[in-house]
Amino acid sequence: TGIELVQDCKEKGYGLLATGEMGIGNTTTSSAVTAALLQCEAEEVTGRGAGLTDQGLTRKQQVVRTALETYDLWHADAFTVLQTVGGLDIAGLTGMCIGGALWHIPIVLDGVISMAAALVAERLFPGVREYLLPSHLGKEPAAVKLADALRLFPVIHAEMALGEGTGAVMMFTLLDMAMSIYGQSATFSEIAVEQYKR
């Protein structure tokens, strides 16, 4: 499970983990999860994924809406939503988010699918979000809504629609640069400069 994966990584000495996924159709499942948990319409959160035509997008939105209505997911708890319309990828990523909190390892979220999993985790165990670092804000319309709901705001705005952990890995480089600046930059007192006051 995702929780066990994080535990294993902790035991091996890892201090930071990235999420990512690979698959076809998983923006459909993440849209359904998002719409259910945020109680919004399918059309508000369902985008083109890997590049659907207008006809394909309309069909995808209909599929999401039908699932929400058929299983009355707007009134369901997070676990029911996950088991009804979330895929194995979203379940595993949800476990990683929970595992990050359990084992005190920050988890760098990739895109919209990871963020949908993060919202499930936060709804199941409030406070999990404190261990999550969002990497990029993708092209899917659910991305902004998920960031707002989680109060986690991605720093990379590159209109990516890739998945597979690409945004999360890019975030590692930014984190390395930030840590380098933090660790190697001189302080005002070290260079005898009066500190700015606001």
Where are these regions (language model features)?
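N-terminal loops that bind phosphate or other acidic moieties
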Residues: 1-198
